[in-house]
């Protein structure tokens, strides 16, 4: 067992000097019925004759004894009160050796050195989360609760190498503990000078016992029996430091170190070796069941976005604790949820976000170390169970907030979001073993029941491997952001996707992408096969895509690695996993309000989606190796066919747009005066604009050519609006004239109106039609511009496989180092800087938290010069551009602008209407199945209660807007 140099050794625990002859004659709580004599009896009076003679002041207490004493007495006061014949002298024999109130017998249990750092936590006990558990209440003894928050410049700690106990050993210790109250034989009751005082001290003083255990866990080497041993042993540095006193005074619960002390772990290994090297998390050491692990990935988002997300998650955890009738949740539900925040790079993280975390108590900057024994730290892990929250207005909130187990992993290097997920799935999840893993992006605000709704899908259907939440756009106060056409068009796009696309794919069982802003996975489904293949292996292949070792196709495909993960789950060998859409779980996210950021974001989305769709189409045969039913496999093939058609339309989207403009605008040549002149002007204008877009996209970044992109998009919108007006004017004149030659254009207008009508009908059926009134006009006017601009820029930048679209912050602060050296007594000593003035820094952070942030303009990032990627990019653009150009020239040669019998245009427009109708059918099927489940659930509740008056249904309220 690792020893704390500040702790009094068992041989020094007695008030007598070391080496006293009567050391082994102290007995605990002896009574007249015990076979062990009481020291106060006359038969032993001679043995304690030394107590009648003054032999000097008692042994000096350790720093830990002073720190954990109930009244925190000074050393001189301790001497005075402990002197012989002092009127306030405590009975030190009884105080040091008194028995724990939770043990009824007088047996002594020898605690093994491999005991857990914390007592086992029984999450199933119906204990009020706002009150203390009887087992957690500190006993009123000499070393009671309370801690003196003093700091020192150096922290020295003794360590030894220990081996983690196996599960069998842990069960043996538990059995000994449970049977000790009735067993009094000599084998289970050990009385010796070497073990008696130590055993009784650790057992009978819970507060000091916890301190010893925490000290033992601070730096040790541990082997995991079921994993292969590491090639090189490394010292594991774990430091527990009190949270600031200003925060501690506001906490309703202070009965456990998880509330009062922040733990820091300096991880010097890669995430794949986290468990094998002996690293763990404090919540796992407490033996708690983990139902949900919520992962928040962060790059350089500001404190307002972080506060919005974390506060909404805390309200979700509080909702879980309110579900008292649930078979899983209830008052202690917070113990089954772990919130893991992973920041991608210490140099990239926003300082305001760090201040926010420090205000919660989970982050202390001075605790982080640069290296341990010369090994560079890969990740800084901070752990705390926080009981307060800070909302988006940066105000403290404690009402209706339950404790939340929070882990903050600050990666030393910036290795992209996929590496953050590697830390989650390969490092933390094997330790916590969660049932469901929920992924949330910083900036997403969840409704109060989102986490529960996502978890409930997995609980009700054992075949569900993943679930997608409903993503909404933040429209600002009173919806003022909708005046920005960019925000309004994205709002309409998100709504149509939530009403048509996601429900359709959910009915088939395969959702092409689970949004990273709000999605959930079953951890068991993510695990690889025994041969190493599986979803996670395919998912993390994208982290090492560099240079000629991997082709551009693979590199771009892994820009949408979440799409690959969705496919691998559904097509997992010898399984029958499906993906579902959860309409009730909503998350509001901020969308790009600037054109440059919007183009950069969609470039990654479009390239990743196209190459991932090609990957799924080429590997559709993997479905045959699954255990899906024949009916499921048939409908999955129907979905593959639908996606293939959608992919073809996407590939030829530029050509279809140009041809639609060409014939709609050309229809006015013979209708109005100077119609042909207008047609020629707009025709050459759109051709020149498209050619300019290719040049701009090939040689400029959106941040550097923002105005050029905006100008091109405005021109495309004007041309599209002109062609649409021409089509409607020509259709109305055709209706007025009643000529047979113009019926074909009437069909064109009807096909267009039917497409928009289907959108409106579906929105009404989902009781969410407001976007049709507030955002549809902006969407339809900007759709051609977005289609052309985004497609051209995406294809012209297939060589760019980078992720980041945001600037970085300033240089990171230099960290101190931790050195483990060999002491003269054979023990290992860890020397490192200890944080100074924790309380003062906390006050500074609180005052700085409310200050507004001013973002500094970041310089242009260094662009990749990989000739191989650029060569492949050129070939892809040439093939795509020439294929669209050949289609345009072929159709133009067949049909003239004045030709009313244009079969190709009719085919395109009715195809769009047919695809929209197919999506509507799938959406209505999803809605029908949803209401059918509600009816069946209601019927089951009625049959269970025997009455039609069911007081409270655990059903989603579909007629009210979710919060």
UniProtKB/Swiss-Prot annotation:
The keyword Zinc does not apply. The gene is CHS2. This is Chitin synthase 2. Its EC number is 2.4.1.16. Changing residue 605 to A: Loss of activity. Keywords: Cell wall biogenesis/degradation, Glycoprotein, Glycosyltransferase, Membrane, Phosphoprotein, Transferase, Transmembrane, Transmembrane helix. Changing residue 509 to A: 70% decrease of activity. Changing residue 561 to Q: Loss of activity. Residues 150-163 have a biased composition (Low complexity). Changing residue 355 to A: 10% decrease of activity.
């Amino acid at each position: 067992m690792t020893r704390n140099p500040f702790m009094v050794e068992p041989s020094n625990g007695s008030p007598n000097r070391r080496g006293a002859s009567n050391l082994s004659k102290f007995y605990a709580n002896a009574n007249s019925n015990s076979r062990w004599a009481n020291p106060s009896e006359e038969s032993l009076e001679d043995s304690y004759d030394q107590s009648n003679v003054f032999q000097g002041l008692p042994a000096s207490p350790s720093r830990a004894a002073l720190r954990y004493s109930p009244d925190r007495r000074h050393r001189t006061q301790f001497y005075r009160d402990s002197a012989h014949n002092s009127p306030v002298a405590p009975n030190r024999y009884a105080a040091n050796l008194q028995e724990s109130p939770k043990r009824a017998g007088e047996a002594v249990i020898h605690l093994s050195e491999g005991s857990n750092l914390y007592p086992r936590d029984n999450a199933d006990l119906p204990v009020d989360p706002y009150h203390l558990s009887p087992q957690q209440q500190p006993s009123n003894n000499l070393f009671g609760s309370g801690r003196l928050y003093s700091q020192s410049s150096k922290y020295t700690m003794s360590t030894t190498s220990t081996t983690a106990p196996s599960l069998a050993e842990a069960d043996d210790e538990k059995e000994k503990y449970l049977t000790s109250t009735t067993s009094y034989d000599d084998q289970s009751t050990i009385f010796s000078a070497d073990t008696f005082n130590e055993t009784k001290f650790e057992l009978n003083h819970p507060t000091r016992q916890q301190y010893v255990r925490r000290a033992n866990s601070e730096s040790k080497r541990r082997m995991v029996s079921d994993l292969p041993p590491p090639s090189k042993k490394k010292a594991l540095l774990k430091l527990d430091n009190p949270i600031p006193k200003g925060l501690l005074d506001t906490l309703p619960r202070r009965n456990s170190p998880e509330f009062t002390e922040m733990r820091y772990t300096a991880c010097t290994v890669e995430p794949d070796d986290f468990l094998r090297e002996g690293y763990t998390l404090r919540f796992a050491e407490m033996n708690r069941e983990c139902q949900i692990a919520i992962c928040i990935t962060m790059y350089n988002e500001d404190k307002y976005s972080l506060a919005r997300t974390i506060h909404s998650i805390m309200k979700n955890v509080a909702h879980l604790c309110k579900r008292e009738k649930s078979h899983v949740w209830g008052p202690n539900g917070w113990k089954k949820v772990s919130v893991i925040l992973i920041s991608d790079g210490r140099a990239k993280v926003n300082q305001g976000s760090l201040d926010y975390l420090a205000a919660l108590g989970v982050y202390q900057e001075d605790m982080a170390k640069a290296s341990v024994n010369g090994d560079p730290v890969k990740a800084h892990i901070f752990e705390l169970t926080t009981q307060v929250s800070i909302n988006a207005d940066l105000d403290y909130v404690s009402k209706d907030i339950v404790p939340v187990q929070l882990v903050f992993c600050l990666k030393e290097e910036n290795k992209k979001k996929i590496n953050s997920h590697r830390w989650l799935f390969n490092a933390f999840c094997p330790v916590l073993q969660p049932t469901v893993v929920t992924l949330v992006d910083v900036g997403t605000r969840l409704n109060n029941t989102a986490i529960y709704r996502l978890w409930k899908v997995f609980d009700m259907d054992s075949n569900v491997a993943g679930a997608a939440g409903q993503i909404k756009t933040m429209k600002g106060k009173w919806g003022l952001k909708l005046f920005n056409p960019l925000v309004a068009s994205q709002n309409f796009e998100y709504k149509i996707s939530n009403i048509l696309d996601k429900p359709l794919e959910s009915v088939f069982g395969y959702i092409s992408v689970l949004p990273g802003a709000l999605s959930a996975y079953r951890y068991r489904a993510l695990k690889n096969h025994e041969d190493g293949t599986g979803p996670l292996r395919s998912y993390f292949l994208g982290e090492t895509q560099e240079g000629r070792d991997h082709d551009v196709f693979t590199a771009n495909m892994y820009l949408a690695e979440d799409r690959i993960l969705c496919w691998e789950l559904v097509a997992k060998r010898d399984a029958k996993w499906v993906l579902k859409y959860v309409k009730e779980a909503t998350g509001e996210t901020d969308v790009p309000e600037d054109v440059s950021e919007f183009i950069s974001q969609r470039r990654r989305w479009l390239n990743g989606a196209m190459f991932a769709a090609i990957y799924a189409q080429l590997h559709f045969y993997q479905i045959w190796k699954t255990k899906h039913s024949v009916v499921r496999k048939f409908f999955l093939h129907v979905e593959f066919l639908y996606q293939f058609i959608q992919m073809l339309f996407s590939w030829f989207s530029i050509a279809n747009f140009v041809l639609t403009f060409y014939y709609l605008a050309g229809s006015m040549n013979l209708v109005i005066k100077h119609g042909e002149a207008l047609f020629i002007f707009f025709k050459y204008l759109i051709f020149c604009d498209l050619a300019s877009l290719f040049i701009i996209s090939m040689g400029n970044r959106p941040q550097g050519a923002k105005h050029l992109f905006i100008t091109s998009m405005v021109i495309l919108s004007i041309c599209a609006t002109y062609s649409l007006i021409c089509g409607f004017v020509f259709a109305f004149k055709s209706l007025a004239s009643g000529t047979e030659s113009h019926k074909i254009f009437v069909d064109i207008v009807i096909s267009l109106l039917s497409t928009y009508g289907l959108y409106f009908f579906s929105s009404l059926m989902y009781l969410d039609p407001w976007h049709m009134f507030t955002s549809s006009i902006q969407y339809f006017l900007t759709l051609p511009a977005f289609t052309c601009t985004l497609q051209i820029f995406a294809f012209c930048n297939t060589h760019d496989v980078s992720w980041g679209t945001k600037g970085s912050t300033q240089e990171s602060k230099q960290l101190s180092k931790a050195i483990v050296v060999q002491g003269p007594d054979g023990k290992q000593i860890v020397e490192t800087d200890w944080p100074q003035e924790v309380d003062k820094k906390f006050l500074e952070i609180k005052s700085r938290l409310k200050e507004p942030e001013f973002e500094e303009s970041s310089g242009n990032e260094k662009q990749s010069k990989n000739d191989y990627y650029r060569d492949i990019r050129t070939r892809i653009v040439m093939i795509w551009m020439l294929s669209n150009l050949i289609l345009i020239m072929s159709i133009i040669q067949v049909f003239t602008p004045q030709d009313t019998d244009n079969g190709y245009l009719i085919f395109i427009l009715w195809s769009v209407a047919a695809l929209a109708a197919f999506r509507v059918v799938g959406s209505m099927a999803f809605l029908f199945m949803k209401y059918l489940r509600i009816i069946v659930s209601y019927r089951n509740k009625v049959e269970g209660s025997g009455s039609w008056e069911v007081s409270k249904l655990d059903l989603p309220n579909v007629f009210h807007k979710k919060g």
